[in-house]
Amino acid sequence: MWGGSKLSSSGSRFLGALRSGFQSTQVDSSRLTTSAVYPKNQLSWILQIKPWVFNENRIMWFKSYSITFACLNWMKSYRLPWTRPYSTSRTTVDKNEMKTFLALAHRWWDEQGVYAPLHSMNDLRVPFIRDNLLRTVATHQPGKPLSGMKILDVGCGGGLLTEPLGRLGASVIGIDPVDENIKTAQHHKSFDPVLDKRIEYRTCSLEEIVKDTVETFDAVVASEVVEHVIDLETFIQCCFQVLKPDGSLFITTINKTQLSYALGIVFSEQIAGIVPKGTHTWEKFVSPEKLESILESNGLSVQTVVGMLYNPFSGYWHWSENTSLNYAAHALKSSLQEQPAPAEFALKGEAEELQAEASTNSGVQEDLKK
């Protein structure tokens, strides 16, 4: 077969000559032959060109051209994640998820309602945040251990976690893209004058406040949030940018395993009705291995990953060594200027995620019996 460039140019000349022949009034179309267009030594291979071959090669050439320039543009715009300028045109907010939480905005503080598991989770996540933050400071004030710290609560909802952090002495900013959630949170904190001073709520997404809050917070909390965002990489990059050097990032979320699908979606949403249907999307769940890879590649060093299990019959959470369902993670932002290159973690990828999905061992059944 002839090369694509030669075939394409010769085919174009041949078709162009035919068009000019049919349009000309001086040349009789019945007498027009290929010998009038090409010398004899070229006829042997020109006549072998078939229309489908020409079209196929033209399509292949166009695709390769497009892919090549797309790759070049990507390489040209790429920068290291911690130095890449952020664009607010990229969003982490899923509008469909917003509709789900908008319908439930008035039920945040019903401790026996759909958010009962989140109320109960405070028994684990508040001490988890407090204890890990205290390891980063030399001294603290009794009764107000987080006094002097500034914390960002991303996806704060009605303020279920924001208020306990404020009671520990921290200055907390809670953000949520659903305005009705923020109104509920503001109304609830207004009953406590102390919290009213320590807590501030804003209706916005994380990426919308990055520009004005670079290296502002001692800690960023994203509890039960990352399984709802549409761009986890961008989300983690924003967390990195708003953290002070040596700042802490706290995440609680759901592992991406077959067990988490069976219990977190099928049982919890469709059978038991513990949470409303459509609250979670299994494709957005993230394994600890994948989350750690994203964190490390964006300048955040993972310190702790620990499993959590919820007993729907008792309504209580407890810690577990097994991370097949829910888990909590704590990462620190490095204070060094030079960060680890993303290439070091690029090979972790899918292999680790597949291993995580197979980690539904017998320890889960033992923990669920407790």
Curated annotation (Swiss-Prot):
Transmembrane segments: none annotated. S-adenosyl-L-methionine binds at R125, G155, D176, S223. CDD domains: AdoMet_MTases (cd02440). O-methyltransferase required for two non-consecutive steps during ubiquinone biosynthesis. Catalyzes the 2 O-methylation of 3,4-dihydroxy-5-(all-trans-decaprenyl)benzoic acid into 4-hydroxy-3-methoxy-5-(all-trans-decaprenyl)benzoic acid. Also catalyzes the last step of ubiquinone biosynthesis by mediating methylation of 3-demethylubiquinone into ubiquinone. Also able to mediate the methylation of 3-demethylubiquinol-10 into ubiquinol-10. It comes from the Eukaryota. Residues 1-86 form a transit peptide. HAMAP family: UbiG. Component of a multi-subunit COQ enzyme complex, composed of at least COQ3, COQ4, COQ5, COQ6, COQ7 and COQ9. One of its GO terms (biological process) is ubiquinone biosynthetic process. It is found in: Mitochondrion inner membrane. Keywords: Acetylation, Magnesium, Membrane, Metal-binding, Methyltransferase, Mitochondrion, Mitochondrion inner membrane, S-adenosyl-L-methionine, Transferase, Transit peptide, Ubiquinone biosynthesis. It is a peripheral membrane protein. Mg(2+) binds at E224, E227, H228. Gene3D superfamilies: Vaccinia Virus protein VP39 (3.40.50.150). Pathway: Cofactor biosynthesis; ubiquinone biosynthesis. Its cofactor is Mg(2+). This is Ubiquinone biosynthesis O-methyltransferase, mitochondrial. Belongs to the class I-like SAM-binding methyltransferase superfamily. UbiG/COQ3 family. GO terms for molecular function: 3-demethylubiquinol 3-O-methyltransferase activity; 3-demethylubiquinone 3-O-methyltransferase activity; polyprenyldihydroxybenzoate methyltransferase activity. It catalyses: 3,4-dihydroxy-5-(all-trans-decaprenyl)benzoate + S-adenosyl-L-methionine = 4-hydroxy-3-methoxy-5-(all-trans-decaprenyl)benzoate + S-adenosyl-L-homocysteine + H(+); a 3-demethylubiquinone + S-adenosyl-L-methionine = a ubiquinone + S-adenosyl-L-homocysteine; 3-demethylubiquinol-10 + S-adenosyl-L-methionine = ubiquinol-10 + S-adenosyl-L-homocysteine + H(+). One of its GO terms (cellular component) is extrinsic component of mitochondrial inner membrane. Its EC number is 2.1.1.64, 2.1.1.-, 2.1.1.114. The modification N6-acetyllysine is found at K144, K150, K197. The keyword GTP-binding does not apply. SUPFAM superfamilies: S-adenosyl-L-methionine-dependent methyltransferases.
